[in-house]
């Protein structure tokens, strides 16, 4: 059930960001019901592979992630809050490491998430930034040779 509260001061924004951090670090198929406690009903989610809007679509992104990577997990390495905590929507950045298994090997992907929170502290915009070429494609045997070749062609000298 949604709780109505104000999230317009630095302390309440920090508390909400810590709640978001805890959610991502304990994310599992059984915790997906908590999405509605964190995201607004029309929230937008974008990463290098998709752009979706609304709680059902965001939940589907995570359901798919667990369907193809059942043992994946996030570790939030840091949180940066905007210099002006009263800015609406409040904007923050989470630096993270995503751990997954590719061809029997545990690998990590480094990235960050840009979050915008409304006055009630719900995420209204979630944008993931990470280098799919370096962090994923180069780790896939079928594409790694192509990515190395492209890197050599593009690099100066």
Sequence positions of predicted segments:
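Short, low-complexity N-terminal intrinsically disordered segments enriched in polar/charged residues
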Residues: 1-33, 37, 153, 157
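A beta-strand edge to alpha-helix "cap/lid" segment located at domain peripheries
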Residues: 2-4, 67-73, 79-157
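A general structural-boundary detector
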Residues: 7, 22, 45-48, 102
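Short, mixed-charge, low-aromatic patches
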Residues: 12-22, 47, 69-71, 124
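A solvent-exposed, acidic/Ser-Thr-rich amphipathic alpha-helical stretch
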Residues: 32-89
């Amino acid at each position: 059930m949604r709780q109505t509260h104000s999230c317009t001061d630095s302390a309440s924004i920090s508390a909400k960001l810590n709640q978001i951090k805890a959610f991502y670090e304990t994310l599992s198929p059984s915790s997906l019901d908590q999405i509605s406690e964190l995201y607004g009903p029309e929230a937008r989610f974008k990463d290098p592979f998709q752009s979706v809007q609304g709680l059902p679509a965001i939940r589907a992104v995570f359901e798919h992630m667990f369907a193809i990577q059942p043992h994946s997990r996030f570790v939030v390495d840091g949180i940066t809050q905007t210099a002006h905590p009263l800015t609406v929507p409040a904007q923050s950045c989470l630096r993270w490491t995503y751990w997954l298994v590719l061809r029997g090997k545990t690998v990590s992907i480094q990235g960050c998430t840009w979050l915008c929170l409304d006055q009630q502290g719900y995420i209204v915009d979630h944008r993931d930034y990470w280098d799919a070429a370096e962090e994923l494609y180069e780790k896939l045997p079928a594409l790694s040779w192509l990515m190395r070749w492209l890197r050599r062609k593009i690099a100066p000298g």
